[in-house]
Structures are given as C-alpha cells and as structure tokens.
C-alpha cells in the first residue's frame, strides 16, 4: 500500500499527470498483470522508492498506452526485454544525495533494476520516461538509448528508450550508492526489496 501511496504523491500530486487514482492510491491496469515491483526500503521498512517491471510479451504502457512514442517502430516484444514504469523516489524521506546531486536511493533503485533484469534472464529494459529522467540516467552512468525523438505529451516532454544491461552501469550504481555489491533481497513473489 505504501508504494501505491508514494506513486500517487509523485505522479498525481507533484507531477500532475493524468493517472488512475483510487483514494490515496495510484493504481492502473498494468498492476493487474503480475508485474515485479522493485522497492527501496528503509531500515524501518518504509518505502523510499519503487519501480514496476513487466514482461514485454503482453500488454505494456509503451505499446498500449503510449504507442505515439514509437514513431514508425514496432513495440518491443521479447522475453529478453522488460518494461519499467512508475519509477519514483520519496525525496521527502530519502534525503541523502549521492554524486551529481542525485538521490542515493535512485542509485540503489537503478542497481536493483539491473540486478532484477539479470535475474529474470533479460538483457534490456524499455521505458517511457521524460527528458528530465533521461538526464538523470545519463549523469548516473546508465544512458537511455532513444527509440525516437521526444514528444510533448500534456505538460511533459516524453520519450521511449532502452536501458541495456551493462557491467559498467551496475558498477557505477554500486559505487555512487556507496555499496559493495548486490542490493536485491528476495521478497514474496513479484516483489524485490533493495
């Protein structure tokens, strides 16, 4: 429940996106498709950040909600490619900054995404994001490979792209988060905690 509350605070309240809200929770149709949720949690088990990973062999946000961001390309459909969505960090609770002014929890969440991608046998993540997040990824050392040029969607300049599996990116996340190695701890089915 904490994760869905965080998503509402970030995507509806702060970013003012048009998202599905039920009470104080942000939940959409993709949450019903057995995604894997990757969470960054505090020592007290408060959710500090989250991201949703979904197989691209079924419905995805890129293919089914934002196909306009594909241009003339086909949506990725492969067991080797996951889709990430709903990436967010609670900057009110996770206040520790790492290099480049990026929140430390962001580096931990990026590392957990890479680890989870590998654990699922995938070699890439496709995502719909905005140009602000694209800059954060580049500064963090995990550059987004654009599918097409950005487009204005409402108040957001959005784009789609790939995040490839990379030893260099994973090492950069560990280093910038001040960690020695793996961050993922297995939790109940469909959830991973970092």
What residue ranges belong to the model's regions?
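Short amphipathic alpha-helix that is part of the acyltransferase structural core
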Residues: 1-24, 29, 37-41, 47
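Residues that flank catalytic or metal-binding motifs in active/ligand-binding sites
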Residues: 34-36, 49, 157
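Glycine-rich phosphate/pyrophosphate-binding loop shared by adenosine-nucleotide-utilizing enzymes
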Residues: 46-50, 82
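Acetyl-CoA-dependent GNAT
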Residues: 53-58
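Acyl-donor binding region in acyl/amide transferases
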Residues: 59-61, 67-158
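Charge-rich, low-complexity intrinsically disordered segments
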Residues: 86, 151-194
């Amino acid at each position: 429940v904490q994760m869905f509350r965080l998503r509402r605070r970030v995507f509806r309240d702060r970013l003012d996106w048009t998202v599905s809200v039920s009470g104080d929770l942000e939940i959409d149709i993709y949450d019903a498709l057995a995604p894997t949720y990757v969470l960054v949690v505090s020592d007290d088990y408060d959710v500090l950040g989250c991201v949703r990973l979904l197989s691209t062999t079924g419905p995805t946000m890129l293919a089914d909600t934002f196909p306009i961001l594909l241009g003339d390309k086909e949506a990725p459909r492969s067991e080797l490619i996951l889709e990430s969505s709903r990436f967010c960090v609670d900057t009110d609770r996770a206040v520790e900054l790492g290099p480049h002014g990026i929140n430390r929890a962001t580096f931990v969440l990026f590392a957990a995404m890479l680890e989870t991608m590998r654990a699922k046998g995938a070699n890439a993540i496709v995502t719909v994001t905005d140009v602000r997040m694209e800059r954060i990824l580049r500064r963090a050392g995990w550059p987004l490979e654009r599918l097409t040029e950005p487009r204005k969607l409402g108040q957001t300049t959005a784009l789609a792209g790939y995040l490839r599996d990379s030893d260099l990116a994973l090492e950069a996340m560990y280093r910038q988060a001040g960690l020695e190695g793996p961050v993922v701890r297995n939790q109940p089915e469909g959830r991973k905690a970092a």
